[in-house]
């Protein structure tokens, strides 16, 4: 077997301090241990087939760690084993953290979700929408937006703002304006990115459709403007420290840099190789952006790196309706609002976007095991999470591959659910 198994007793003890026993009903595991072992064999096979270099999987139920194992390698060439405390680029799993930050400011009365973004970032006043463009992708005419972008539009990706790496009518415009996806080792700061973005047209009128885009990056700048702190300091002071998250950063301190997992690419499904940042739709000027370069960009949409265990602490706060250490990071009603489905993202109503993640509305056409009301999201470099309020369950899967041709993350989730008694 390739898997590197690590003890999870110490994290379990910590979880008891973070989420006191009285916050959960008396606990009796709902899992079949023999069925859980199927995960080990599946991940070993994915590694042997060179689909992924390695992975860390974590399952927590009722605040107790059920499963926390590492497999394969953090760096294949040096045969550096994957460990439970390996640090991964979590990319869009950053978005849920940013959404929590916005909701914290909402609860402080510093903003309304119906507020126009221009109230905090004046450059967004008078946004325009694409009207026509030519066959070369050049926009030839725009019109005034029917209304301004609101905070809620950013939270639900219904603002009309796109992503450079997702093909759209804005692709050429974003390229010419040098709009980035938020990940860089260059000397670019969040303010410059957002002010530049505000000058670009929208794909559609705010609130009228859905397009995944740089919305959480804009929200990150709103947090900076309202809190008077950089997004980095706000996250550390207001979220990570209260949750005891000691391994989650935009840029890793020197004593933790060696734990960053190497990024791989599987261009054509024939096996992984070390990524140079140019193989996928997301261009990286440096795949090692969490440790190299200027370290000036704080992307609220994609910038964080973390461990499976650290991120599980954040997810447990969501599952426990904002409660942590007998205090409320957020109120129960705010968490309820965040996990309320708002905009259909898969055309059949099964998945709707909440405030930072997809929410499962029904299972009528589902091909995966899940629960109605569960919510989930993932990152571009093959990390994913889900929270299941019905089963009092969270799952985290982390690897580092893009492009990826593996089904390991989906299989991990299905194998977790098939292990429930």
Positions of predicted regions on the chain:
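Short, conserved catalytic-motif segment at the N-terminal edge
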Residues: 27-90, 110-112, 126-134, 406, ...
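Bacterial N-terminal signal peptides
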Residues: 11-21
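Short, well-ordered beta-strand elements
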Residues: 384-386, 392-401
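Low-complexity, glycine/alanine/valine/leucine- and proline-rich hydrophobic stretches
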Residues: 372-389
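Short, surface-exposed loop or secondary-structure junction motifs
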Residues: 125-372
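Bacterial N-terminal signal peptides that target proteins for export
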Residues: 2-10
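Boundary at the C-terminal end of the N-terminal hydrophobic targeting segment
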Residues: 23-25
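Active-site SXXK
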Residues: 37, 43, 63, 89-120, ...
């Amino acid at each position: 077997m390739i898997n590197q198994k690590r003890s999870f007793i110490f994290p379990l003890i910590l979880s008891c301090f973070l989420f006191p026993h009285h916050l959960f009903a008396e606990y009796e595991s709902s899992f079949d241990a023999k069925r859980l072992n199927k995960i080990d064999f599946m991940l070993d096979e994915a590694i042997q087939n060179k689909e992924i270099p390695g992975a860390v999987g974590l399952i927590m139920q009722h605040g107790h760690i059920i499963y926390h194992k590492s497999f394969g390698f953090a760096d294949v060439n040096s045969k550096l084993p994957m460990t439970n405390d390996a640090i991964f680029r979590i990319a869009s799993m950053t978005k849920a953290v940013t959404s929590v930050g916005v909701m914290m400011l909402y609860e402080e009365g510093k903003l309304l979700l119906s507020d126009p973004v221009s109230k905090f970032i004046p450059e967004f006043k008078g946004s325009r929408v694409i009207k026509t463009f030519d066959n070369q992708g050049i926009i030839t005419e725009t019109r005034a937006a029917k209304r301004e972008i609101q905070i809620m539009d950013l939270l639900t990706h219904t603002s009309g703002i796109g992503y450079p790496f997702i093909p759209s009518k804005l692709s050429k415009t974003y390229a010419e304006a040098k709009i980035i996806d938020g990940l860089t080792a260059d000397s670019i700061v969040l303010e410059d990115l957002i002010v530049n973005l505000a000058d670009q047209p929208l794909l559609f009128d705010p609130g009228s459709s859905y397009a995944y885009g740089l919305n959480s990056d804009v929200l990150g700048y709103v947090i900076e403007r309202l809190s008077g702190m950089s997004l980095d300091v706000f996250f550390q002071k207001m979220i990570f420290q209260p949750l005891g998250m000691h391994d989650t950063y935009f840029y890793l301190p020197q004593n933790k840099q060696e734990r960053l997992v190497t990024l791989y690419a599987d261009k054509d499904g024939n096996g992984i190789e070390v990524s140079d940042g140019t193989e996928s739709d997301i261009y990286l000027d440096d795949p090692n952006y969490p440790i190299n370069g200027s370290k000036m960009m704080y992307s609220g949409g994609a910038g964080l790196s973390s461990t499976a265990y650290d991120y599980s602490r954040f997810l447990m706060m969501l599952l426990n309706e904002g409660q942590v250490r007998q205090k409320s990071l957020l109120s129960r009603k705010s968490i309820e609002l965040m996990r309320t489905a708002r905009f259909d993202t898969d055309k059949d109503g099964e998945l709707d976007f909440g405030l930072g993640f997809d929410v499962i509305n029904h299972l009528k056409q589902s091909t995966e095991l899940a629960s109605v009301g569960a919510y989930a999201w993932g990152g571009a470099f093959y990390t994913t999470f889900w929270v299941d309020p019905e089963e009092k369950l969270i799952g985290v899967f982390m690897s580092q591959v893009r492009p990826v041709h593996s089904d390991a993350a989906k299989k991990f989730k299905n194998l977790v659910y098939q292990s429930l008694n």
